[in-house]
Amino acid sequence: MQELPAEWYGFQYRLDKTVHDDVYDIYSYINEAIHHSVTVYYHEETKEYKLRIRIGQIEFCRIECIAAKLDVFETLLRAQFDDILHDLVEFNPKTVSHIILAKHITEWKYQSLLPETLEGFTLFIRPSEPVRITNGSYIVFDYEDFSCDSNFIIYYNMFRDEFFGEARINNIPDMNYVFDSQKLSELQEKLTLHLIPRLQEIHQRAKEARK
């Protein structure tokens, strides 16, 4: 850790040394301006060192960076960490699977109808720059309202060949199946009918929960 820079692609180094349940956070690189962070931690349950990535309000473990032995983990970090941080601040087309390209997600014409702000939410991730997370899923687009810890995301899962929607309301996951679709055309129809009402519902429930 003595070799780690204080700043890296706009991310600020933070020494954590904190315990949450069976997870020991060692250190993090944080960019609050873009709501991204990367945390190196040890998971007691699995006896493994891991890397946790936060994008907006979504957190996931990077499966390519897991190791039971510290020296192996350090090797993985040296090989991957720079690219991980770089790709968080600048979209890398190489992270997009050929399956995503074949579904025409990045060139989806409907994205021109997704406004930068909608019902108090801000477009945080857009279809032209999808984000790979875990379990074969990509974030297609993401509307965020950080002021109430709430969002709405459309995902695509490559294994199921399915689009689906998921919200967070006061940082608590909330799913329904209204947006489940096999094709972009089907998803587009459902978004036209249900996107605005869903965002309104999320805001209303977030507001009520904070009373």
Where are these regions (language model features)?
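Negatively charged, low-complexity tracts enriched in Asp/Glu with abundant Ser/Thr
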Residues: 1-29, 83-149
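Structural alpha-beta junctions
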Residues: 10, 161, 196-197
